[in-house]
Amino acid sequence: MTATRNVKGLLGTKLGMTQVWDENNKLIPVTVVQADSNVITQLRNAEVDGYVAVQIGYGQIDPRKVTKPLAGHFEKAGVTPRRHVVELRTADAASYELGQELSVEIFEAGQKIDVVGTSKGKGFAGVMKRHGFHGVGASHGAHKNHRKPGSIGGASTPSRVFKGLKMAGRMGAERHTTLNLTVHAIDAEKSLLLIKGAVPGARGQVVLVRTAVKGA
């Protein structure tokens, strides 16, 4: 599948949330993402790979902890080893160069973006917390069933539990994408992106900031 649109993206570290005043004296909640040391580590093309994309490396890592195949991969690109890599399919991949550094200035204030991250892990959670079940009545015959899911299926028909039924289980720690967020401001000197609203993940989590897929 060939990319038909230009997509820009950066890997960064979520530093946390704060609030800033806008020009209308309105308090805006923002998430601060630091996106420094992004570099192009590989270029994909349709002739060799069957699709066009750029591979971006981010984050420092001790060279002694890098496997030899990966060390050779980074050496071929002429860059120091990076801890995280991600591929972005974009139609203008040929306009990039190996070893090219990317800064937060590829985005601009007011631009719509998507942020991909790993949601906070909540551990084993019940159906009320995990799926928003209302639970069972607090009285009138309910006996130690207040937070239970209730019936999970029929007896003789269908005499089984359907796949995908909402039950208790591990919650969170999953890849999550928040669409159509807005870049509130950019600090190029400190490589910071101020993104209006919340983004997935905990403080210190690596997130991918990219051009909005839906382009709203």
Swiss-Prot record:
Residues 137-157 are annotated as: Disordered. It holds the Pfam family Ribosomal_L3. PROSITE patterns: RIBOSOMAL_L3 (PS00474). Keywords: Ribonucleoprotein, Ribosomal protein, RNA-binding, rRNA-binding. GO terms for biological process: translation. GO terms for molecular function: rRNA binding; structural constituent of ribosome. The keyword Magnesium does not apply. The keyword rRNA-binding applies. Part of the 50S ribosomal subunit. Forms a cluster with proteins L14 and L19. Belongs to the universal ribosomal protein uL3 family. One of the primary rRNA binding proteins, it binds directly near the 3'-end of the 23S rRNA, where it nucleates assembly of the 50S subunit. NCBIfam families: L3_bact. This is Large ribosomal subunit protein uL3.
